[in-house]
Amino acid sequence: MHTKLLFKENVYLRSCRATIIDIVRDKKGVYFISDQTVFFPTGGGQSCDVGEADGIPVTDVWEEEGVVYHRIDTDTCPFSPGSTVSMQIDWHLRIDNMQGHCGEHVLSGAFYSLYRGHNRGFHMGKDYMTIDIALDEDSGFQKITDDMAREAELRANEVIWADLPVSVHHFNRRSDAEELPLRKALAFDTDISIVTLGDENAPADCVACCGTHPSSSGQIGIIKIYKVEKNKDMFRVYFEAGKRAFRQYQHQFDVITELGNRLSAGTDDLLKKFLVQQKKSDAVRDQLYHLKKEIVARETVEIEKDPNLLRCRRYSELSLDDLNEIGKKLSGKIDVLLFLVHQPTCTVLLFSDTCDCGGLVKGNARLFNGKGGGSKKNARAVFTEAESLQRFIDHVSSQLQADTALGD
């Protein structure tokens, strides 16, 4: 028994009624098998349709040896063999998948026709799609440059603007399918579906595919490449198509508009004003760096002059890295213990040439709801509030004074 795939007859069909053939249960859930289905099962790099069956969510669909399994989100299955069920797919997801998958064909065809680039891998992710393009050794191209990607993107969108017909032909024999100008060699011998964009004699693309596609390229809407990166001996192209690309455009436009408002710039001079602002920020950052270096040097000298064996300094403007730098500069000059407190984060750094700083933190921080660790020469402890941090310092100081009779 094979499940009849209604989407092969009409990809725009959103619902149907079917007869339940069997119910399957395992540790992962409950599944039903029906005589026909409107749901597309996972395959060909495309995720499955989701939707409902008599109001019950259908969360996963796959095909095995011609039989389609529908996973339903329920513990007690209301269906039984012989009963009928009404199926409804999530149409928005179907459209996204149709636009995305057909967009992949269009873009792959563009890379192939322009650069003899072969699609060796395809992934439809939640946030973007990717194709892995391998260039022929005799293509004359060593890599896919930004300019090449822009040219392929333009060619792909020109195919969309031409609103070419998208036809799907089914073949039972490999030899019959191979009469078409295929972009890619066939991987199987029977039950072959070939998707062709445009004229079969000179198509924009022609390749085997089991996915769902719109009836014309114009329904894809738009294709946008985001980036190209090296991936082993290929080039991975990140892109989007259709509504997903449009939503990304909207988001990017909103970001650019907000940046323009903040910089009092239009789109024409936004980059120029940003670079000016960046130059100013770099100058301020450089000044801050040198000022902090000077403060760290002065603090190091002041602490070194402090005659107390237990020393504690508090800071709100310097960073933890700055405090760590002070402690390192004083290495070899700390007879007992130095506390450096970073007030914004309720963190204390411990430095010593003679005490086990890590041991002091490990043995005492938890007594005051703190946590931390470190080595013998330096450690840090973090607390939820300033009061707990101060109690920790007082406790450790008293402990050391008792151990070394510093109070005498």
Question: What do the PLM-derived regions correspond to, one by one?
Answer:
Residues T37-A53, F79-D132, K376-K377:
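Active/ligand-binding-proximal structured segments within catalytic/core domains
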Residues T257-P344, L350, T354:
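Hydrophobic helix-and-loop "lid/oligomerization" segment in the mid-to-C-terminal part
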Residues G45, D199-Q219, L310-D408:
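Glycine-rich, acidic loop segments that terminate in or are immediately followed by a histidine
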Residues L93, S113-N231:
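Functional cores that coordinate and move charged inorganic groups
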Residues M1-S83:
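Conserved nucleotide-binding/hydrolysis modules and their immediate coupling elements
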Residues S15-D22, V168-H170, P307-E317:
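Short amphipathic
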Residues V30-F32, E65-D75, M129-A134, T347-L349, ...:
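A generic structural motif
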Residues H213-P214, G218-K272:
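A conserved active-site cap/scaffold subdomain adjacent to cofactor or substrate pockets
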